[in-house]
Amino acid sequence: RGLGDVYKRQNFDRVVFTEEMRKDYTILCPQMSPIHFDILEPALASCGYNLEVLPSTGECLDYGLKYVNNDACYPSLLVVGQFMQALLSGKYDLNKVALIITQTGGGCRATNYIGFIRRALEKAGMEQIPVISMSAGIEKNPGLDINYKMAVRALQALIYGDVFMRVLYKTRPYEAVPGLSLIHISEPTRLALIS
């Protein structure tokens, strides 16, 4: 067996996220920064996307270890683990769900997240699920339209996230009651302030 045989066996076809899918698919996004991503979710909803940011639980690491090789970095285990935990939970229609992740195109393993995710889906028998690469054109997905409105909303969410994070880090050392600062910038409070 040569390298050519291995290449032929691999399935390099991917499921493209189409405009038709955009209408009724739930797009799952890994939690990478709770303050920022909780604001990003409604920002993208206002642009017509049914985005759901997944919770990061202690159990997601176990799912990541099951579906990713042991040589992968810790963040990639968490990301793949969040996706697989959600998909295997029974909460989602596996024929009406897509996954989204950024793809840098750089030397970091973050570029390989797409491959890790697709491999995990294949191992679990879920190859029909589209994996959307949110990148500067590495992969095309007609159902993801990064237009001016979406870019502005996403940037606003990130800026608000930075503001809330700075407030939290500046006030936390002076808390009279531990955890009070975090309660004051909880998700409902943040969303009420920016809407």
Where are these regions (language model features)?
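An N-terminal assembly and electron-transfer interface module characteristic of large anaerobic redox
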Residues: 1, 5-190, 195
